[in-house]
């Protein structure tokens, strides 16, 4: 098992990364739990892992109840959030009841947002069961639900008490979901660590085969990079925006196609290539760099091109992006592979040229 600590102005908390951790969840997490816990999970994860977690909590003397939600990005909304609140109220959850998110990014984001708002703030912990949530969404305190006009538009910054990533849960992940998570892994190398990017180029087959040693190394490096950035910029006033590489284009894809049609990681993958193409247009990187990024994404089973839709739709969706400031669109581009930069775009012609092959 590897452990690292996230330090933020709010508070510090541990991330546990390894194999076979879920049966130890009670003992590992007990210092970070109240006397009572509410397990929030979904219909897909519950048959696989809920019983193991319940047994672990029983062994640690933590009483608990469970709330089982429908699965999928299409359910990341007010209606499903209210199901969490209904379950908490019906079970007389108190302010010190710890919410436990057992699932992927959707469960983690919604559980965190519920925790941030239930009785004005209840503690929560993350037990991510997908690669995407283990390397990205479970760390850093971003919580949210979607709105029909934009992804993750309603939410809060609210840090968990702990994160427990059991890599064994990835063995039940569908291949498409594994690839989607790998998009975020590749994103980290692309935005901030060229040596990690090169390591991924060398080890992608082993990672996709879930070989234990390279997998724990990759997950740890991603969490380490995110923890370092969040420690410097908890509420995304500056460099934390780098973590949104590919997300401005990616969120537009998800919104246009309908939440869940393209998985988040798939949209981010195509978005990263578009961000590289935009950086090409700005004279920052070469076409060869963009092709190299696309090749690595394709090696992970990911799309390197977006779906085709009208330029006006792209602009409409991207105008709702959370990085827009004073009406100016801000993108995360690349100075070079391994170095992200915040880029303001006032000339939409450069966006049209970037997107032209896909219009």
Curated annotation (Swiss-Prot):
Gene Ontology molecular function: any one: metal ion binding
Cofactor note: Binds 1 divalent metal cation per subunit. Can use either Co(2+) or Zn(2+).
Pfam families: DHQ_synthase, DHQS_C
HAMAP family: DHQ_synthase (MF_00110)
PANTHER family per UniProt: 3-DEHYDROQUINATE SYNTHASE (PTHR43622), 3-DEHYDROQUINATE SYNTHASE, CHLOROPLASTIC (PTHR43622:SF7)
Sequence similarity: Belongs to the sugar phosphate cyclases superfamily. Dehydroquinate synthase family.
NCBIfam families: aroB (TIGR01357)
Descriptive protein name: 3-dehydroquinate synthase
Source organism: Neisseria meningitidis serogroup C (strain 053442)
């Amino acid at each position: 098992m590897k452990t690292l600590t996230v330090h933020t102005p709010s508070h510090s908390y541990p991330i546990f990364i390894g194999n076979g951790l879920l049966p130890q969840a009670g003992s590992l997490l007990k210092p970070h739990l109240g006397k009572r816990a509410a397990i929030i999970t979904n219909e897909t994860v519950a048959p696989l892992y809920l019983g193991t977690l319940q047994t672990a909590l029983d062994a640690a003397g933590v009483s608990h109840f469970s709330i089982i939600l429908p699965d999928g990005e299409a359910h990341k909304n007010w209606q499903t959030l209210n199901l969490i609140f209904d379950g908490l109220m019906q079970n007389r959850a108190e302010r010190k009841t710890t919410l436990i998110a057992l699932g992927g990014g959707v469960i983690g984001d919604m559980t965190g947002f519920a925790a941030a708002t239930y009785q004005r703030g209840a503690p929560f912990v993350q037990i991510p069961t997908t690669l995407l949530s283990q390397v990205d969404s479970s760390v850093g305190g971003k919580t949210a639900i979607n709105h029909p006009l934009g992804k993750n538009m309603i939410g809060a910054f609210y840090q968990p008490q702990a994160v427990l990533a059991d890599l064994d849960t990835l063995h039940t992940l569908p291949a498409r979901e594994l690839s989607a998570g790998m998009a975020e892994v590749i994103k980290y190398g692309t935005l901030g660590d060229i040596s990690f990017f090169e390591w991924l180029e060398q080890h992608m087959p082993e990672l996709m085969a879930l070989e234990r040693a390279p997998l724990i190394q990759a997950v740890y490096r991603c969490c380490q990079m995110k923890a370092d950035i969040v420690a410097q910029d908890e509420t995304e006033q500056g460099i934390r925006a780098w973590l949104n590489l590919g997300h401005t284009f990616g969120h537009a894809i998800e919104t246009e196609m309908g939440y869940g049609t393209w998985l988040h990681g798939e949209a981010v993958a195509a978005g990263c290539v578009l961000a590289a193409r935009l950086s090409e247009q700005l004279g920052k990187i070469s076409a060869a760099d963009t092709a190299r990024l696309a090749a690595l994404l394709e090696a992970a089973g990911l799309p390197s091109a977006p779906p085709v839709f009208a330029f006006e739709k792209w602009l409409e969706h991207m105008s709702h992006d959370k990085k827009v400031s004073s009406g100016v669109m801000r993108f995360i581009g690349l100075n070079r592979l391994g170095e992200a930069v915040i880029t303001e775009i006032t000339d939409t012609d450069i966006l049209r040229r970037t997107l032209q092959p896909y219009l």
